[in-house]
Amino acid sequence: MAEENQVAAPEEAQTPFELQIQRIYIKDVSFEAPNLPTIFHQEWKPQLGFELDTETKQLDEDLYEVVLHINVSTTLEDSGDTAFICEVKQAGVFTIKGIEGIQLAHCLASQCPNVLYPYARELISSLVNRGTFPALNLSPVNFDALFMDYLQRQEAEQNAEAPAVN
């Protein structure tokens, strides 16, 4: 009998995950201090407001723009006067290969913003410093936790909308 050599068909070659930064840039920036210089004569008891959002756009196959929006506003506790408002849109273009679906969504909502956040944080700190306000050091953000919260909210909304089965 002749021996038959059976070669298993190679599984579809999977492209390894690849994340490359193509460019990081400031898309928009604004700093307002509407009550200067009178605000410097008030006691400095700030109340900080912080808003964070991301926006993604596919530019080409495997090429994405991610924009991190951060708005920081500070008012004085006693008077309610606005000390400053700082709005930053820090953006980046990323090549992302080898993933799709929920993994791609996670990369765009977590890994890319993790790259952008230190740039935005430094820019905000610099703007506040140039306004001659006390130093502002923004805390790190856990984008993985934010993404998981988003997924849980989506799941809860879908479950709430699903018709009840009797």
UniProtKB/Swiss-Prot annotation:
Q: Which GO terms describe its cellular component?
A: cytoplasm
Which Cys residues form disulphide pairs? none
- Record carries keyword Chaperone: yes
Where does the record place it?
A: Cytoplasm
Instruction: Please name the InterPro entries in this protein's record.
Output: SecB, SecB-like_sf
Q: Which NCBIfam families match?
A: PRK05751.1-4, secB
Keyword line = Chaperone, Cytoplasm, Protein transport, Translocation, Transport
What is said about its interaction partners and assembly? Homotetramer, a dimer of dimers. One homotetramer interacts with 1 SecA dimer.
Which biological processes are named by the entry's GO terms? protein folding; protein tetramerization; protein transport
Question: Which source organism does the UniProt entry give?
Answer: Actinobacillus pleuropneumoniae serotype 5b (strain L20)
A Pfam family for this UniProt protein?
SecB
Q: Which GO terms describe its molecular function?
A: unfolded protein binding
Q: Which residues form a coiled coil?
A: none
Role, per record: One of the proteins required for the normal export of preproteins out of the cell cytoplasm. It is a molecular chaperone that binds to a subset of precursor proteins, maintaining them in a translocation-competent state. It also specifically binds to its receptor SecA.
> What's this protein's name?
Protein-export protein SecB
What gene is this protein translated from? secB
Family of this protein:
Belongs to the SecB family.
